[in-house]
């Protein structure tokens, strides 16, 4: 019985020692930085440490009493388990001032006494300067021996690196300090490349999957998560902090690409998730190079893995960023806007049901803006519709409906969208807004082709042929080539040129052929092409330009040939027009492209492409397939270790450190532009925009997607005015004032000449 009692007593002592050692380890694992912040918000932790210290002292007294009462058993313990008796309560007392780094995000209370700070600071260890050899030693201990201490040390160093240069005053609570950019780069490369895999092993994350929201929710109930979740939060929180400090595109791209693998852990930290979405949206909307692509992939990964937690925020934020990018438009920026639109459409595919809800709301807002313009007929209301933001939003939703036309969720918004586009095209039917109407026609053709629904586009096109500007001889000379794809409105002098007339007529022919070729195999082709054919014959009689007459006669002959081809096939069938069998009528001929109009449409497309290429001075091509992700887009998500390290070394190869002066020198081009503005001159781009009608009249800054905006009393367009004059007053606010000041023009012009001469002398 004595032996059994001895064993029980040994077990009891061992368990007490293990508990004490566990408490000691927990205290030793604490990060020194957060004790200052933690004790500001919670003073009860001091009591906790005191209770642990009291328990340790009590255990030490028990050992002393045991030696006095039962010296034989104490001797037995010395011989068989001497380690159990080696216990010192001062170990806890020495390390009782350190707290774990688990609160990286919560805001701390302010206003504690400076004396308390100084007392705590005295107990903290002296800061150590991190060297490259220390980083190598930590990484080796993690890789070879899988030591948890190495993980904690490298994360502390990572925190110090991310917060380097922060305005912390005389804060000495951090254990490490980074002194060189070489060490900073080394820490960043290693942690961003390897920490995701290390954390997954610690948390015993399933290896066969990258995880979803459900996986994380299950993981939060496990013991490894309770032990190591503060490491995950530390990694994600510090990474977010350094992302906000970075200025180099390659650094941000590499950091965001690596963080994408750990994005699933954000399901456990909702506030961090919102901040990451905000940062990624900012980089997507303003970044250059591969950064927008990587940001899109990051957001897409979040939407797929976390679902409803972030889908709404991502959709709304991306739509807002897209609209902001459409505020100021020129020929060079159209490609970027098209790319952003394709990114948004790609993101909508992650949750089509949620996409429908957002599409319904935003399309309804566009409809309300159009309705306001139709009801009020004010200059300001028209300008809200006839601007790039509104048109690009229509193109965005057109692309979305076309991309997901095979899915039933987005098909219901096709009809209201087509109604809005038709209303926009007919709002101000003048020659100066021909480019805008042609854009609307292209959108309607895309919708019709994607949904298989007939939309009466031909009337919008043949109405343009009857405009007086196209039936008069050109009084403005030949003029420069007009690219109608990059404009919403052309200038007054350009309307009177021969180049504008040719561009209008040829584009109308191209879009009309595109529309009719979609229904060239329809059983009702003769009926739907009858009225457009009559209107085209009328234009042939009225036009005085032989080149236009020749073009229209060729189109009419192709339409008649196609009608004859369809009528011959239709005479052989026995089903009624409302029969479902009508859908399969001439299906084989349509796939093979054997109808006369389909063959003619192919020729017209090639001619249009050649004409557009001759007008484009740069490599900007605007269209549904124009936006590409670029050469720097990652080919796959999985990278091997060497490739990962190489990319990291390429990104973190500069002497940049957080907190350093990131303000870059102003480019010489920007300086030149500013000098020209001061002298009153204009840049080449601005002059080109003035010639093409891309001036201030087409850019409206107060675009609001809401019907609640208060309207001011503006000039109302009456019905007795000439149509062109009315539209000029909408687009040119200075028209009225110029008539009033006509009498004082000479006086003003003399003063202007004198001022200009003075500026020229000062500039020289």
Curated annotation (Swiss-Prot):
Is the keyword Nucleus assigned to this protein?
yes
- Composition-biased stretches, type Acidic residues, lie in 90-113, 693-726
Q: Where is this region: Disordered?
A: 23-67, 89-113, 627-646, 651-726
Q: What is its main location?
A: nucleus
A GO cellular component term found in this entry reads: nucleoplasm
- The signal peptide here is none
Q: Where is the composition biased (Basic residues)?
A: 42-51, 673-682
The coiled-coil segments of this chain are 3-69
Question: Which regions are flagged for Basic and acidic residues bias?
Answer: 30-41, 52-67, 661-672
**Database matches in InterPro entries:** Noc2
Q: Which Pfam families match?
A: Noc2
Motif Nuclear localization signal 1 — list its residue ranges. 673-680
| Key words, A-Z | Coiled coil, Nucleus
* Renumbered ranges of motif Nuclear localization signal 2: 738-745
> How the protein assembles, per its UniProt entry?
Component of nucleolar complexes. Forms homodimers. Interacts with RBL and NOC3 in both the nucleolus and nucleoplasm. Binds to SWA2.
In the record, the note on similarity to other proteins reads: Belongs to the NOC2 family.
Q: What does this protein do?
A: Together with SWA2, probably involved in pre-ribosome export from the nucleus to the cytoplasm.
* Protein's name according to its UniProt entry: Nucleolar complex-associated protein 2
Organism (species): Arabidopsis thaliana (Mouse-ear cress)
Q: Which gene encodes it?
A: NOC2
């Amino acid at each position: 019985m004595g032996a059994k009692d001895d064993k029980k007593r040994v077990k009891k002592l061992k368990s007490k020692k293990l508990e004490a050692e566990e408490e000691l380890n927990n205290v030793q694992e604490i990060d020194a930085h957060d004790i200052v912040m933690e004790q500001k918000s919670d003073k009860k932790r001091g009591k906790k440490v005191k209770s642990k210290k009291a328990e340790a002292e009590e255990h030490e007294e028990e050992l002393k009493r045991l030696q006095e009462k039962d010296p034989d058993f104490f001797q037995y313990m010395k011989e068989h388990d001497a380690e159990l008796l080696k216990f010192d309560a001062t170990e806890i007392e020495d390390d009782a001032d350190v707290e774990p780094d688990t609160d990286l995000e919560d805001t701390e209370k302010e206003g504690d006494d400076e004396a308390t700070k100084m007392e705590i600071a005295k107990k903290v260890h002296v800061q150590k300067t991190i060297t490259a050899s220390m980083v190598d030693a930590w990484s080796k201990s993690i890789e070879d021996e899988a030591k948890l201490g190495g993980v904690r040390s490298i994360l502390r160093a990572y925190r110090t690196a991310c917060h380097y240069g922060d305005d912390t005053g005389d804060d000495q609570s951090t254990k490490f300090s980074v002194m060189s950019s070489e060490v900073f780069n080394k820490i960043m490369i290693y942690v961003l490349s390897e920490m995701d895999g290390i954390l997954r092993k610690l948390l015993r994350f399933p290896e066969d999957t990258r995880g979803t929201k459900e996986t994380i929710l299950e993981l939060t109930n496990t013991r490894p998560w309770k032990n190591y979740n503060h490491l995950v939060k530390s990694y994600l929180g510090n990474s977010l902090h350094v992302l906000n400090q970075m200025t180099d595109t390659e650094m941000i791209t590499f950091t965001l690409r690596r963080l994408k693998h750990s994005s699933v852990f954000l399901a456990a930290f909702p506030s961090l998730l919102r901040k990451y979405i905000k940062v990624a949206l900012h980089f997507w909307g303003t970044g250059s190079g591969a950064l927008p692509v990587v940001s899109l992939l990051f957001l897409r990964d979040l939407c797929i893995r976390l679902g409803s937690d972030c889908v709404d925020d991502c959709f709304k934020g991306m739509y807002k960023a897209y609209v902001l990018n459409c505020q100021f438009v020129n020929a060079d920026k159209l490609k970027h806007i098209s790319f952003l639109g394709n990114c948004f459409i790609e993101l909508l595919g992650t949750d089509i049901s949620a996409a429908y809800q957002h599409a319904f709301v935003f399309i309804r807002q566009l409809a309300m803006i159009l309705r306001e313009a139709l009801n009020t007929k004010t200059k300001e209301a028209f300008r809200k519709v006839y601007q790039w933001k509104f048109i690009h939003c229509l193109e965005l939703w057109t692309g979305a409906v076309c991309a997901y036309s095979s899915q039933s969720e987005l098909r219901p918004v096709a009809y209201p969208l087509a109604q809005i586009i038709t209303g926009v095209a007919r709002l101000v039917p003048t020659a100066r807004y021909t480019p805008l109407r042609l854009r609307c026609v292209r959108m309607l053709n895309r919708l019709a082709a994607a949904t298989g629904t007939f939309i009466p586009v031909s009337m919008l096109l043949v109405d343009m042929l009857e405009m007086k500007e196209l039936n008069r001889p050109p009084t403005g000379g030949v003029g420069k080539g007009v690219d109608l794809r990059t404009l919403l409105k052309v200038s007054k002098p350009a309307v009177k040129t021969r180049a504008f007339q040719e561009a209008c007529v040829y584009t109308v022919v191209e879009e009309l052929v595109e529309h009719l070729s979609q229904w060239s195999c329809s059983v009702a082709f003769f009926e739907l092409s009858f009225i457009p054919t009559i209107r085209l014959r009328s234009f042939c009689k009225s036009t005085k330009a032989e080149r236009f007459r020749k073009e229209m006669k060729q189109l009419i002959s192709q339409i008649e040939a196609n009608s004859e081809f369809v009528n011959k096939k239709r005479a052989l069938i026995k089903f009624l027009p409302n029969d479902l069998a009508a859908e399969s009528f001439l299906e084989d001929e349509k796939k093979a492209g054997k109808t006369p109009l389909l063959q003619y449409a192919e020729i017209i497309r090639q001619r249009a492409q050649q004409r557009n290429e001759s007008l484009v001075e740069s490599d900007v091509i605007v269209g549904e397939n124009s936006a590409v992700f670029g050469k720097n887009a990652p080919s796959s998500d999985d990278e091997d270790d060497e490739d990962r390290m190489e990319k990291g070394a390429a990104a973190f190869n500069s002497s940049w450190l957080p907190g350093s002066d990131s303000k870059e020198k102003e480019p010489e081009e920007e300086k030149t532009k500013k000098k020209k503005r001061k002298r009153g001159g204009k840049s080449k781009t601005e002059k080109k925009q003035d010639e093409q009608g891309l001036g201030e009249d087409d850019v409206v800054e107060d675009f609001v997607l809401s019907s609640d905006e208060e309207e001011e009393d503006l000039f109302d367009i009456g019905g007795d005015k000439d149509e062109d004059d009315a539209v000029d007053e909408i687009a040119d606010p200075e028209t009225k004032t110029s008539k009033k000041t006509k009498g004082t023009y000479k006086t003003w012009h003399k003063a202007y000449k004198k001022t200009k001469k003075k500026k020229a002398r000062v500039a020289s």
